[in-house]
Swiss-Prot record:
CDD domains from the UniProt entry: GIY-YIG_UvrC_Cho
UniProt record similarity statement: Belongs to the UvrC family.
InterPro entries: GIY-YIG_endonuc, GIY-YIG_endonuc_sf, GIY-YIG_UvrC_Cho, Hlx-hairpin-Hlx_DNA-bd_motif, RuvA_2-like, UVR_dom, UVR_dom_sf, UvrABC_protein_C
Binding partners and assembly: Interacts with UvrB in an incision complex.
Protein name per the record: UvrABC system protein C
Gene Ontology terms: cellular component: cytoplasm; excinuclease repair complex
Residue ranges annotated for the UVR domain, each copy included: 204-239
Function of the protein: The UvrABC repair system catalyzes the recognition and processing of DNA lesions. UvrC both incises the 5' and 3' sides of the lesion. The N-terminal half is responsible for the 3' incision and the C-terminal half is responsible for the 5' incision.
Keyword Metal-binding: no
GN (gene name): uvrC
Keywords: Cytoplasm, DNA damage, DNA excision, DNA repair, Excision nuclease, SOS response
Domain GIY-YIG: 17-95
Gene source species: Nitrosomonas eutropha (strain DSM 101675 / C91 / Nm57)
Amino acid sequence: MPDSSFDGKAFVLTLPSQPGVYRMLNAAGDVIYVGKAIDLRKRVSSYFQKSNLSPRIQLMVSQITGIETTVTRSEAEALLLENNLIKSLAPRYNILFRDDKSYPYLLLTNHAFPRLAFYRGALDNRHQYFGPFPNAGVVKSSIQLLQKVFRLRTCENSVFNNRTRPCLLHQIKRCSAPCVNLITPEAYREDVNSAALFLQGKQDEVLKTIEQKMFEASDRQAYEQAVLFRDQMQALRMIQEKQFVDSSRALDADVIACTTGTDKHTVAVNLVMIRSGRHLGDKTFFPQNTHEDSISTVLEAFVSQHYLNRSVPPLIILGKKIRVTLLQKLLSEQAGHKVTLTINPIGERRKWLDMATENAQLALRQKQIQQASQEDRLQALQEVLNLPGLARIECFDISHTMGEATMASCVVYDHYAMRNGEYRRYNITGITPGDDYAAMRDVLQRRYAKIAMEEGKLPDLILIDGGKGQIGVASEVMIELGLNDIPLVGVAKGEARKPGLEQLILPWQEETLHLPNDHPALHLIQQIRDEAHRFAIQGHRAKRAKTRKTSSLEQIAGIGSKRRQNLLTRFGGLKGVKNASIEELQQTEGVSRALAEKIYRELR
């Protein structure tokens, strides 16, 4: 438990000279820093003996009221634990990289006619995976490309198994329609193999195979088929010309470059992914809490945190020197294969690093321009509302369809950016359908009851997507919770309901406020309000679709989750079940004649 009379020098004497992890706590009991050490006593004592600590570290030490330690068997184990704790606790004085969702893959399923699909999650060795890719857009564009060249199916198995005629994708020459046997299993398998070779970087091999097929088709006077093969070759050659490829060998590598802004506080880390010699794309990260840290320190933190519980390529190329030996050992153990970290490469790999550095510099310039714009907008809003020091804004919206599947959203804007990780959705039940006031009351009570008990951050401003009625309800809730000192602003759409005509409802004055269409404060309000609306309607649509898809079947006596799934799988969805005859329903596993008749009757 943190102690305001904590004596750091005395505490150090109780520590062992062994590897481990230490956690520094403040008066509130929050972990403000996590570190690792080969020698716990020596490392922790350095914070209380050095006189040349940076101002930032001096401030951190002044806030320490307790330290917790964990002894580990090795420095590598300490490094692993340190990064697990940094990811889970996000201490304010550690360099933090946003923990994105797992990287997406391109999937070829284990099926007689394999399906080409976007995939994110745990890997199953029954299927073929290609990647990882830096973002979803790269995977989706790759799927479109492979559809165009190899015409592989992308439909779900439930749809594939129940088609009776080719779909639109076949008509536009994006699928060979294996669902209705317009291609033989052998020919489809050849297309799948060619697609797999292409994704493995063996484009020349694929081109030779297609060229041979083209000549064979021409010799048989199957000119229409020969033209198809010719078009495939042309498409593949165009792709080759656009791709950045390592001509020496088809290796897998990640290239990581880091750059700082002119203020030395803003840092960008660019990750370029090379798989099978192909440049799959890049992704830029902007770490938090990097004040006074060197580029080498930032890079080491990135490598440590980024590859935790992720796939690791055999080669990682870096532009600055870091402690390679420990990281290589840890990453190799985690990956199950040798991982090499290369510093300052030459030749072709130097070009890759230069490209990553240029990407990082460009992304940093763009972010600084964007942040300057956000600073101007926030400053304008502070002046309009007379709220100096305004930093954190929370916005609420309610979404439903005629009272069905009501969903509320709360989005967070803090220090010039939307904070996606702090967004929350609230499932609204137990109210009169369509009662927006009751829905707003419910979400605000649930959101701020915990914060009133000091279990979260208080916003500097609350935006409500609505007019005087919603603001009135919001004011009542905040008074009940003792939080009525937090300013509330309602964002009403106005009579024409057009962007730019919004009226701001301010509880502390009678007249509504109307800002000019080009006012930067209005632009910030619109940005936050639109994000709350998007997040709410996205959740509402998902809830509504789930309800509509399952409720009709689940309300029938005798239909549990297993029988419902059997029916939906067999008929490709609820619509197929509704259109099925009693005899067809009876053929479903677990469905008797009597139950089939009941389903037929209930769904009509």
